[in-house]
């Protein structure tokens, strides 16, 4: 039943003494207000903002400096004030969309004014200013649209800093961790945790490679994300950070299989006391937390974080760890009859088998024969594993 219609009708029922006011409130509690997500309005704001930027850019050279400043300041003020008024008096989603346009205008104004007065920034500082305003709007209006806007601005700014200037912008990083990080750990909403985790992974990659750090520091950063979920997020929540950290380090091991034997990569693997100290502390906490868990099988995930780059055959050891990881999850899933573990092990095993086959057979086997045998092998493995998975799924549970 439509809640708005129920509100009107129930008021009449109270007036006609059909129900009491208490009963009316209990009835309305069964039909809570729907939280409408203004997706269309958000895209509308985005397109209007892009239309503004396109118009200004196409006519920018024909305007005087005074005319340019008037257009930017007027647009920014009008959109923000109208958005604030509409938000408070009329419609919150429409108001948010107008304020979002103002945020886009503000960001573009930073770069346009810099171009107008021939100011060149050799860092991501303009993105930092833009992020501060976006984060401030998020704190004021408490709307998730501004959370994602802030996250996108920070991530794009950090990517820009890394690719263009080969530098990690420390202030963007601090605002990301202390600002958005604090919020996602407090809210614990899956979509926001996932978005933050993806951005964290990109930040870690940019930090390591733009600052000339050895690539293996990524293991510590991914392990940190894994540990954060163990100690700062409540039990029973969705394993968002852990899943992202596992996917990231799994991908890293795959790359090690192909490139760790390369001479150039070998030069990057000089031992680092600080790395092993950080890794040992994080790994210790992970092991302790895993031992304290009611489901002790999650120690299998920690195998992926073992640093094998210091060994001469690090590429083969990386492949061995991938096989061991997938087989242990398969065996554990079959023993405990947990279909989710079987699914995880199945996917990991098929990927690892294909990687091993590709690594070992690509150089000497005829290409057509290579793909034919590989396809038949994967088909046979998938058939066998799917048959076992269905058997488990019929009586298996989730852990």
Predicted feature residues:
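Alpha-helical multi-pass membrane segments and their bilayer interfacial helix-loop junctions
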Residues: 1-399
